[in-house]
Amino acid sequence: MARPKSEDKKQALLEAATQAIAQSGIAASTAVIARNAGVAEGTLFRYFATKDELINTLYLHLKQDLCQSMIMELDRSITDAKMMTRFIWNSYISWGLNHPARHRAIRQLAVSEKLTKETEQRADDMFPELRDLCHRSVLMVFMSDEYRAFGDGLFLALAETTMDFAARDPARAGEYIALGFEAMWRALTREEQ
């Protein structure tokens, strides 16, 4: 009879995968992930049948953490798309600065070709306000299947640059975050907004 799965082991594997992917990208080996979680590699595959399943599960795990962080402070009375987008940008940057390994990992995962359509849909469903806001304000080309990953990559590159400068010079972090937002807004959204 198979032993029941432990939630603690699963969380340890997800945390080890976060660190490994943040450091080495999606090429991080399952052996390293398992070792850093304190389990045998075979144990990893009891929890995740394939590395792709681990990648998709980790993406959803990190996305849920990020979305919970953003939703926690969300003022749902804001109706202006630019103001709402600024709030989400600020929350995203704050989360990334407070959790740099998680941010590096989610960035690697978001632009990988390993995410399934189901995973992308589940991630979109976690924060419907964000999905709706994107449909209202993001250029339609970046909402298309063909260019969505490119648009995500642009957003993430601008966010990463903003985080790098904010972390290097905390006294000017607010200025960098505001300038980063304006650059992102002009690059990815419809001009009529």
UniProtKB/Swiss-Prot annotation:
Matching InterPro entries: DNA-bd_HTH_TetR-type_CS (IPR023772), Homeodomain-like_sf (IPR009057), HTH-type_TetR-like_transc_reg (IPR050109), HTH_TetR (IPR001647)
Record keywords, A-Z: DNA-binding, Repressor, RNA-binding, Transcription, Transcription regulation
SUPFAM superfamilies, A to Z: Homeodomain-like
Pfam families associated with the record: TetR_N
Domain HTH tetR-type: residue ranges: 7-66
Knockout consequences: Deletion results in a multi-drug resistance phenotype in the DT104 strain S/921495, with fourfold decreases in susceptibility to nalidixic acid, flumequine, enrofloxacin, ciprofloxacin, chloramphenicol, florfenicol, and tetracycline. Significant increases in expression of RamA, efflux pump subunits AcrA and AcrB, and TolC, in DT104 S/921495 and 14028s / SGSC 2262 strains.
Note: Binding of RamR to the promoter region of the ramA gene is significantly reduced as a result of deletions of various short sequences; deletion of two consecutive bases probably contributes to the multi-drug resistance phenotype of the BN10055 clinical isolate. RamR binds to various chemicals in vitro, including bile acids, such as cholic and chenodeoxycholic acids, and antimicrobial drugs, such as berberine, crystal violet, dequalinium, ethidium bromide and rhodamine 6G.
Protein function: Transcriptional regulator. Represses the transcription of the transcriptional activator RamA and, thereby, leads to repression of the expression of the efflux pump subunits AcrA and AcrB, and TolC. Acts by binding directly to the promoter region of the ramA gene. Promoter binding may be inhibited partially by the small regulatory RNA StyR3, perhaps thereby ensuring a basal level of expression of RamA.
Self-association state and partner proteins as the record states: Homodimer. May bind DNA either as a homodimer or as a pair of homodimers. Various chemicals reduce DNA-binding in vitro, including bile acids, such as cholic and chenodeoxycholic acids, and antimicrobial drugs, such as berberine, crystal violet, dequalinium, ethidium bromide and rhodamine 6G. Binds small regulatory RNA StyR3.
Protein name: Transcriptional regulator RamR
Gene: ramR
